[in-house]
Amino acid sequence: MKENQKIIGMHYLKGWIRQMSESNVLTSIVEGVLEDLEKRRIPISKLNEQLKSAPDLRGAYKSLSKPGMRLIAEIKRSSPSKGALAEIDDAKSLASKYQEGGADVISVLTEERRFKGSISDLIDVRNSIELPVLRKDFIVTEYQVLESRVLGADLILLIVAALTDSQLKDFYQLSTELGMDVLVEVHDLDEAEKALNIGSKIIGVNSRNLKTLEVSEKTFELILPQLPESVLKVAESGISTGEQVAKVQDLGAKAVLIGESLVKSGNPVHTINQLLNR
């Protein structure tokens, strides 16, 4: 593991931005993530020391592999596309309701600027429930992978569009070595091929283009049927009805990640039952 993470992070940022042909939302988000990371960074030696006392893992893959459609329920205050979604003063209370409703994994946004999430949300939620927890963020450095394990993330998100091929491979390998499951997110067939090439067990198909924020359900139709049965397929973004859940299930999805319709619901337990037709 590398000591000079700050230099690595900034080198990554400059190199990654040079790859982009035009300004987009994802570039802006990654810039902010790296800036915020510098404010909380501790020496990598101390982070490695904290790994020794990291919480026991809960097995997100196992939880999502149960028969029937599974749910990753997300705690999300805001988004770049919709702005403010819900006032969530107590993330752990909402997580408890998700657990009561039958969610299988709780997704916690930790990105601060666009999604109004926080690391403290992740810690609070994991300490208040028994379900596995997904750290939903823009992971673009090795430091964040290590940090995620220290914080207690059972599942970590790696977005193919935000990483070089070597970073995707290295971060995936490190995550699995640390015992975490990995949700590898793709937006097109080329990204899906990259996810398969590194041996991804869980692949999330996001119908939202992170560069333009546009949503197209055709993304599900294009990618989900092309993924092998051995992969645990997750449908992400733009899903708010039971009919949509049933449709992506027919396309091969074994789980859905839903946030907006749940955080805006006055009764998330009831909403979960409606979405999953229970």
How does the language model describe each region?
Residues 222-226, 264-278:
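C-terminal helical cap(s) of enzyme catalytic domains, especially alpha/beta-barrels
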Residues 145-162, 168, 174:
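A short alpha/beta connector and helix-capping loop motif
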Residues 202-251, 256-258:
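Catalytic-face loop-and-helix region of soluble metabolic enzyme cores
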Residues 102, 128-131, 150-156, 176-180, ...:
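Glycine-enriched alpha-helix->loop->beta-strand junction motifs that scaffold or abut catalytic
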Residues 152-163, 205-212, 253-271:
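Glycine-rich phosphate-binding active-site loops on the catalytic face of alpha/beta enzymes
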Residues 7-133, 140, 174, 180-199, ...:
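Conserved N-terminal beta1-alpha1 strand-loop-helix module at the mouth
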Residues 140-151, 190-198, 240-256:
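Catalytic cores of alpha/beta
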Residues 122-125, 171, 223, 275:
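Aromatic/hydrophobic pocket-lining residues that form π-stacking "cages" and hydrophobic walls in ligand
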